[in-house]
């Protein structure tokens, strides 16, 4: 299977690359940052360094058209503390980015997709009475990200 990873040089993306290669997949990735020097990034992975939010739909579509599967291992996480109000920042980085990639993946004929989100989504689903998505804009964006991916 040919798999395209958005965010393949981050922690989850990097280890996903390794695991996919181990299972015989062909892997390509679009990453915002080059891999850290201390990582032995696999030469078999086609690596393109670019900000997915700044490249054109046509360029992103070209990556997706070469893939059977997509893994979205990008977005902004809760370690980032944006200026108030925080929700628009998290929405743009998680929900809008996912909507765009999934729309283009569908257009490209990608057969399968996996979204790496957050353990907060699992907590939100397990304990809805806590209303976690109402208490933090990051959690809200990750819950909405999953819904956006399903559309």
Each model region followed by its residue ranges:
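Conserved Rossmann-fold NAD(P)-dependent oxidoreductase catalytic core, especially the SDR/UDP-sugar
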Residues: 96-141
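SDR active-site strand-loop-helix element
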Residues: 6, 30, 73-74, 113-119
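Conserved glycine-rich Rossmann-like NAD(P)H-binding loop of the short-chain dehydrogenase/reductase
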Residues: 25-32
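A glycine-rich helix N-cap at a beta->alpha junction
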Residues: 146-147
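N-terminal Rossmann NAD(P)H-binding glycine-rich loop of SDR-like oxidoreductase domains
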Residues: 3-23
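Conserved beta-loop-beta element that borders a ligand/cofactor-binding pocket
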Residues: 151
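Short loop/helix-cap segments at secondary-structure boundaries that form the rim of catalytic
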Residues: 36-43
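NAD(P)H-binding glycine-rich loop region in Rossmannoid oxidoreductase-like domains
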Residues: 45-46, 50-95, 122-129
């Amino acid at each position: 299977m040919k798999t395209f990873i958005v965010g393949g040089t981050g922690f989850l993306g990097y280890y996903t690359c390794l695991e996919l290669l181990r299972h015989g997949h062909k892997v390509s990735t679009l990453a915002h940052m080059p891999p850290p020097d201390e990582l032995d990034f696999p030469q078999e992975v086609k690596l393109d360094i670019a900000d997915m939010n700044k490249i054109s739909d046509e360029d992103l579509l070209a990556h997706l058209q070469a893939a059977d599967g997509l893994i979205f291992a990008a977005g902004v996480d809760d370690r980032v503390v944006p200026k108030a109000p925080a929700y628009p920042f998290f929405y743009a980085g998680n929900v809008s980015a996912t909507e765009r990639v999934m729309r283009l993946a569908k257009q490209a004929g990608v057969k399968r997709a996996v979204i790496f989100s957050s353990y907060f989504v699992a907590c939100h689903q397990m304990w809805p009475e806590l209303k976690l998505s109402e208490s933090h804009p990051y959690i809200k964006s990750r819950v909405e990200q999953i819904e956006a991916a399903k559309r």
